[in-house]
Regions:
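Acidic, polar ligand-binding/catalytic clefts
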Residues: 19, 23, 27, 31-96
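Short glycine-rich His-centered loop
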Residues: 1-13
Length: 118
């Protein structure tokens, strides 16, 4: 939920969270160094101390909460899973998509949740 514009200035809700923490901890919301990370890099960067705070899309699971040596501070964004189809399909339930080809980002909790659903 953040991006860097053409000038390299970061914006978005994740950036706002980081600025809020910097303001609370350092008294200055500009005392932030943004480090773009992929989903694969994020936990290693936090565990190694490369970053002090991870503010990005990360599903709070019991295995992550208990087994990764990190502390989730609270939910900043709550989402769900939905399916978008053409209205001509006439579907009344997501269950009618069983056996259909569904586009999902690989390696995400959403992928696992959808596989469990069907």
């Amino acid at each position: 939920f953040s991006y860097a514009d053409a000038d390299g200035k970061f914006s978005g809700i994740d950036v706002d969270v980081c600025r809020g923490v910097a303001a609370a901890v350092f008294g200055d919301d500009t005392k932030v160094k943004y480090t773009p990370l992929t989903a694969k890099e994020r936990f290693t960067a936090l565990q190694s101390g490369e970053v002090d705070l991870l503010s990005r899309n990360t599903t709070w699971t019991s295995s992550r909460d208990a087994g990764m040596g990190m502390a989730f501070t609270g939910v900043t964004y709550y989402d769900g899973i939905g399916f978008l189809t053409h209205d001509k399909a006439g579907l009344k339930s997501a269950k009618e998509l069983d056996g259909a080809t569904v586009c999902i980002q690989a390696g995400t909790d959403t992928e696992l949740n959808v596989a469990d659903y069907f």
